[in-house]
Amino acid sequence: MAMGDARTTESARQIAMVCLEELVRGDDRYRRIDEIVGDWGFVREAARPYYSEGVGRPSIDPTVLLKLMIAGALEGIGSMRELLRVADLRLDLRLFLGYGLGERLPAHQTISETQTQRFADGEVFERLFLRTVALCQQHGLLDGTHLSVDGFHAEANAALRSLRASLEPRAAEAEAEPGAGDEAASEPPQLRLAEPRSGPTPKRKATNATAVSRSDPDARLKGKPGQRPHLVHRGQVAVDPKRRCVAGCLAERAEGYEGDALGPLLDRVRFLLPELASVGADQGFAAERVWEDAAERGIIAYIPPQKTMLPRDGRAPRTNAQRLALAARARAKSEAGISAHRLRMADAEGVIAELKNHHGLGRVRCRGTPAFHLQLLLGCAAINLKRLAKHAPTAEQGIAAAPATPAAALSAVSNEPHRDQLRTTIRLGRKQLIWTASPSLN
């Protein structure tokens, strides 16, 4: 074989008429997302209250800003500067944003200001997430009868050295005299240390009751036994086991009881999933009020109780909490309860790992619980869009797709020694498609 001619830079300097749409593959992820979503007009409608009509110069299209944030969540890029460097070089992202080869992308300050200030209340991101859930339901990616719920901790954007002794208002020693109300109202409130000598020092351990972070007051100290504590925020996700789509999410402070988040999560999904019949969670959600609230909603809660909640030595239950704990243990040990437990481990914990490792939820970029909630909404919306790009087009193009196994039917599969033993083969002429009915399907 003869050696080919050497390539020079002359061909790269030539002017050519190219079409950006022809340079991007037809099965590109962002092209498929754009086709599935279709009309992005809901973004402009949700963002309209944040702009002035006819005042000032025209701003950048809010749809472009939101698409850039979606791309950052899909790529797992937290830095806006790095995101714009990547988007400037990639043809698929330029086509997704609607920018030509020679057009300059928005500045990184504009994107940061949009996320942290203009859309800080989260209404636009809530509309985006709800739209992705509705699209998943429209394309048959949601079963809607069972949800797997689990929580996780995301490291806050604050260091331990930012901890300072917390302050609380000083109680009045005596009641104010008549007529002195105006003078007392004008004086600033008197503060004192929450606990004397409670500030963190090298010899004194800080706790949430005695210290607060100056950088992020919403962050809380959490740590496993024997490990160094970290300042974290807590997030909750509700995952549908059919295609592991996220049906609901919630961000909160990492304090109090974890099970109190189950009620707000169910309130968020009750209109999207009216046929919801059961929910599965771990022992961290076990409590009397949680079981009672689920029963009032007509939902079966597969939440195993903790050992301290059960009667000792096999005695009869003496309180209502012990009776509910025994009933919860019976549900957890049933065939459906075992299936719900395995679904939670495979789906909810799998989605949490996906959020942390691939979508930037391992560490909070901004400060405060509301900012973490925006980041969580973007990450969950990115997961749903990724599921849509993978599964929705196959059904629309008429290609035989794997029928998803409902959550209730997976209990028969969960007892097998290997989760991928149940296989079905579909022959399509010369092609052969094999699908696996197991909870590990993406």
Regions found by a protein language model. Give the residues of each.
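Short, flexible loop/hinge motifs at secondary-structure junctions
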Residues: 1-20, 401
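Anion-binding and metal-coordination hotspots
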Residues: 6, 76-89, 99-442
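A short, ordered amphipathic alpha-helix with a cationic face
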Residues: 7-10, 57-58, 101
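Generic alpha-helix structural propensity
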Residues: 15, 28-31, 42, 59-66, ...
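A general alpha-helix detector
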Residues: 19, 64-70, 110, 114, ...
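Basic, short loop/linker segments at the boundary and entry of helix-turn-helix/winged-helix-like folds
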Residues: 24-70, 75
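Short amphipathic alpha-helical interface patches used for protein-protein assembly/oligomerization
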Residues: 93-97
